[in-house]
Amino acid sequence: MRDVKDTLRALVRIGYDGRVFKTFRGPKAGERFANEVRVLRHLEAAGCPFVPRLLEADPEEPRIVTTNCGSRVEHLDEARRAELFSELEKYGVRHDDADKRNVTYRQSDGRFCLIDFEFATILPGFEKKPDGAAT
C-alpha cells in the first residue's frame, strides 16, 4: 500500500488494487468516521457521480474503504472549485471543507471529484427518516 496522507487526524493509503483505505485518528475519530459513512451513504443513494463509493466501514478501527476517485488536483481555478462544491449541494450535502486538497481528477471519465467528508453536513430537507422518506 502507498501512503497518501499521514496526519494526526487520518492515515490514508491506496491499495495495489486502487481502493482507498482511510483510518481515522485523534480527537473525535469515531464521530468523524460515523459522519463520513453517513454522508457517503447519502450521496450514493442520491446518485452523486463525483464522490467515492463506500465499500467497507469498520467502526472498531475506525476505518473506511472506498473506491478511488483519481489523483489530487495541483491547479484549479477558484471559480471552478466553487462550482464543484456548489454542485454537491444539489445532492443535499455541504462539504464544510471546500479546499482544493479535497478535489481529485478521475482520468477514466475526465471528471473532477470531491473527497473527505468527515466534516460534511447533510442539508435540512435532505435528511432521511427511518422509513426512507426525506424530512
Which residues make up each language-model segment?
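ATP-binding glycine-rich loop module of kinase domains
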Residues: 1-42
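Short acidic loop-to-beta-strand element that houses the catalytic metal-binding Asp/Glu
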Residues: 11-13, 54, 102-104
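Short hydrophobic-acidic sequence motifs that mark active-site Asp/Glu residues
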Residues: 12-13, 18-22, 51, 65, ...
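Structural motif
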Residues: 15, 58-60, 106-108
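Beta-strand-connecting loop/turn residues
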Residues: 17-18, 62, 101, 110
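Conserved structural core of kinase catalytic domains
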Residues: 25, 29-33, 41-84
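Hydrophobic core positions within the conserved protein kinase catalytic domain
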Residues: 40, 85-88, 92
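C-lobe/activation-segment region of protein kinase-like
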Residues: 76-80, 89-96, 101, 106-135
